[in-house]
């Protein structure tokens, strides 16, 4: 910087005389003494000094001395950089990293398998099926199946004990494989395994990647149905289902003459009791429930004409409790001919309204009515009179 200023101003004055010695920067050869030994120094210092030679012409003495000092500095830095440079035989990577990379490539445990040694995308049932279907006799022993799998798929050459157990379980627990005993003509060890004749549609179009459906033998299905049918809970359910059918048969076999004879009775409750008691179903709780429930249902075993005839004769015996309650009852939606057979729909005993939804209690109530008859009505009227007589022992006007 000072040299350029001196050249531009063309001042022949010596700058060293204007400054003290401690105010002027020292030379470069004195600066290297304060640098650490392991500091980085550029290797192209000599090129810089050579490029600065054009300034040496016409320069005063101090500048030439500085240039000479730079030349000695370049030789010294070359020796320092040469001592720090790595040997030419080694690469740019650290020594330990190169050794680890070579060991990684030589390790057989980390060797990546190719596609031929990969696990095949087939289940054990698919492997067994393929082996049997490719056999000339369409049957193979267990050892032959093992050998066929090992020869075709190198993956199964390791850990043979594991997948061989899976093969045996697949043969035993699947209905699509049948065990065929050896014939006397072919002596040897182990029985043959073949496919079930009806298991040909397990796989879709010969693709063994996935089964279309699980094959189940029909014989095993029938055996399971018989075992389920022998359970004790099914016996009671079957008897309950048969009870309404037997009652319908009894009601259909009942003659109109018997209905007329029953209609001659005085009490309505006694006639109902006679109709239910005269049936061959019996007095068991199950039969009573079925009888009371069937009074509210349309008998499926009869035709419309026969049913209307029975209703016309027994209209005073069987009243529909839902007839006058809502417009969507079955009697409201039937034909007008059937509506004509109900002239006294609204004439129903109001005491049975709270017993409509309880069939057991309604049957007990009818039995109670049939036993007492009209005595219940007379007794109730007498008790009511006595009750009010006790309350009003004297006239009301006299109390005023």
Swiss-Prot record:
PROSITE patterns: FORK_HEAD_1 (PS00657), FORK_HEAD_2 (PS00658), FORK_HEAD_3 (PS50039). Primarily expressed in the dorsal blastopore lip (Spemann organizer) of early gastrulae. At later stages, expressed in the dorsal mesoderm and the neural floor plate. In the dorsal mesoderm, expressed in the notochord but not in the presomitic mesoderm. Also expressed in the mid-brain area. GO terms for cellular component: nucleus. InterPro entries: Fork-head_N, Fork_head_dom, Forkhead_box_C, FOX_domain-containing, TF_fork_head_CS_1, TF_fork_head_CS_2, WH-like_DNA-bd_sf, WH_DNA-bd_sf. Its main location: nucleus. Residues 218-234 have a biased composition (Basic and acidic residues). Residues 249-258, 267-277 have a biased composition (Polar residues). Keywords: Developmental protein, Differentiation, DNA-binding, Neurogenesis, Nucleus, Repressor, Transcription, Transcription regulation. One of its GO terms (biological process) is regulation of transcription by RNA polymerase II. The keyword Nucleus applies. One of its GO terms (molecular function) is DNA binding. It is found in: Nucleus. Residues 119-213 bind DNA. SUPFAM superfamilies: Winged helix' DNA-binding domain. Residues 218-290 are annotated as: Disordered. Transcriptional repressor involved in embryonic nervous system development. Plays a role in the induction and patterning of the anterior-posterior neural axis. Involved in the establishment of floor plate differentiation from neural plate cells during gastrulation. Binds the anf1 promoter sequence to restrict expression of anf1 to the anterior of the neural plate, thereby patterning the forebrain. Can bind to the HNF-3-alpha DNA target sequence. Cooperates with t/bra in a dose-dependent manner to specify dorsal mesoderm formation, including notochord. This is Forkhead box protein A4-B. It comes from Xenopus laevis.
């Amino acid at each position: 910087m000072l040299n350029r200023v001196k050249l531009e101003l063309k001042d022949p004055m010596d700058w060293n005389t204007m400054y003290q010695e401690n105010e002027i920067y020292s030379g470069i050869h004195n600066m290297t003494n304060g640098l650490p030994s392991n500091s980085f120094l550029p290797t192209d210092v000599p090129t810089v000094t050579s490029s600065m030679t054009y300034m040496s012409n016409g320069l005063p003495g101090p500048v030439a001395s500085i240039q000479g000092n730079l030349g000695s500095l370049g030789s010294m830095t070359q020796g320092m950089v040469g001592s720090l440079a790595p040997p030419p035989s080694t690469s740019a990577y650290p020594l330990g990293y190169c050794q680890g990379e070579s060991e990684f490539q030589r390790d057989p445990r980390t060797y990546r398998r190719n596609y031929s040694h990969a696990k095949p995308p087939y289940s054990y049932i698919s492997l067994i099926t393929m082996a049997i279907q490719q056999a000339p006799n369409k049957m193979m022993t267990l050892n032959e199946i093992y050998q066929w799998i090992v020869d075709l798929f190198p993956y199964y050459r390791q850990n043979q004990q594991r997948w061989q157990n899976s093969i045996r379980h697949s043969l035993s627990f699947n209905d699509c494989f049948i065990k065929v005993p050896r014939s006397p003509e072919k002596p040897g060890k182990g029985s043959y395994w073949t496919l079930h004749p009806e298991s040909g549609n397990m796989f879709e179009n010969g693709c063994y990647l996935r089964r279309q459906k699980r094959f189940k033998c029909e014989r095993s299905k029938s055996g399971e149905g018989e075992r389920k049918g022998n359970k004790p809970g099914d016996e009671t359910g079957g008897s309950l289902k048969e009870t309404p059918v037997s009652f319908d048969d009894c009601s259909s076999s009942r003659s109109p003459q018997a209905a007329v004879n029953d209609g001659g009775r005085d009490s309505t409750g006694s006639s109902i009791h006679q109709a239910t008691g005269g049936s061959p179903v019996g007095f068991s709780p199950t039969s009573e429930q079925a009888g009371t429930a069937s009074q509210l249902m349309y008998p499926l075993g009869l035709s419309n004409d026969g049913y209307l005839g029975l209703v016309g004769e027994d209209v005073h015996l069987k009243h529909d409790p839902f007839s006058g309650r809502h417009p969507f009852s079955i009697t409201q939606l039937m034909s007008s001919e059937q509506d004509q057979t109900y002239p006294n729909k609204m004439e129903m005993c109001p005491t049975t309204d709270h017993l409509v939804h309880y069939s057991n209690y309604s049957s007990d109530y009818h039995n109670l009515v049939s036993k007492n008859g009209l005595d219940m009505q007379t007794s109730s009227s007498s008790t009511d009179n006595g009750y009010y007589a006790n309350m009003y022992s004297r006239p009301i006007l006299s109390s005023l």
